[in-house]
Structures are given as structure tokens and as C-alpha cells.
From Swiss-Prot:
InterPro entries: Hexapep, LbH_gamma_CA-like, Transf_Hexapept/Carb_Anhydrase, Trimer_LpxA-like_sf
Keyword Metal-binding: yes
Cofactor: Zn(2+)
Family, as annotated: Belongs to the gamma-class carbonic anhydrase family.
Single GO term (MF): lyase activity
Sites where the protein binds Zn(2+): H54, H71, H76
SUPFAM superfamilies the UniProt entry points to: Trimeric LpxA-like enzymes
Protein name: Probable carbonic anhydrase
Organism annotation: Methanocaldococcus jannaschii (strain ATCC 43067 / DSM 2661 / JAL-1 / JCM 10045 / NBRC 100440) (Methanococcus jannaschii)
Biological function: Probably reversibly hydrates carbon dioxide.
Protease found in the keyword field: no
UniProt keywords, alphabetically: Lyase, Metal-binding, Zinc
Amino acid sequence: MISKNVRIAKGAVIVGDVTIGDYSSVWYNAVIRGDVDKIIIGNYSNIQDCCVVHCSKGYPTIIGDYVSIGHGAVIHGCRIEDNVLVGMNATILNGAKIGENCIIGANALVTQNKEIPPNSLVLGVPGRVVRELTEEEIKSIKENALRYVKLSETLESYK
């Protein structure tokens, strides 16, 4: 089920068993394919331009509230808790779990079944926790998600 106040940009593709929560947005040319297992996207989250969100049998994709998935990221069969920023072109693979209040840096690769603890900054290939986030950084993740809610008001919705 896609909430009635979700904003979906022209060119985005959403198929299969997909649930998207209130005030979330899906941007230009993003692909969300719940054709093999389910995909759940929480409230106030955004899937930015050219992202791919997919799953594998037995590996649903679960994305929490206040999550920003940056341009070109690939999110596949993993769990992302609340208040997370996934940087541009990052990849998160099957069975990975990202704890709340994390930043996954641009181009980082979170490998299969990797668990990232809450409040972590992850960088590199393969992705490694490099330090704990500051309170200011944690706050900025939610602020970014809320900026996308506001920005999505300029979209015509193509549900």
C-alpha cells in the first residue's frame, strides 16, 4: 500500500509488494521492485533520483522513518533503521542491517549480512565504521529528511 500523501516523481517505477508510509517521496527514475519479496518504506523517507530498491527471496527490504537514500544508491534485501542517511551511489546488500542514526558515506559498500551499530559513520569499500556520529550530525539526518518532505511538495504526484 502506498500512502495517499506519498509524492512520486515522473519516471519512477514501483512494482510488486511495496508499502510506502506517510510523507515519503520517490524521485525521478528511481526503481522500487517488490517482485521477489516485500519492500517497506517508512514515514518521512525519500528515495532519490536513480536509486534501485530491490529484494531477494527471504531478504525483504525494510527502510525506516526519516531515511534519505541518496542519488544512485542500491538498496538490496537489507534493513535500514530510523534516521539514516545513505550517501550517493552507496550500496547495501542482502542481510545487512543498518542501525538507527547512521550515515553511510557516498560510494560505500555495506557487504552481505554486515551489521552496522547505531550512531555510526561508515565509509569505504568494503564499508567500515570509522567513528561515532556527533549529536549535531544525528540531528542533521532528520533535518535532511524533512527538507525532502518540503521539497517534494513541488512535485506533481504521478501515482
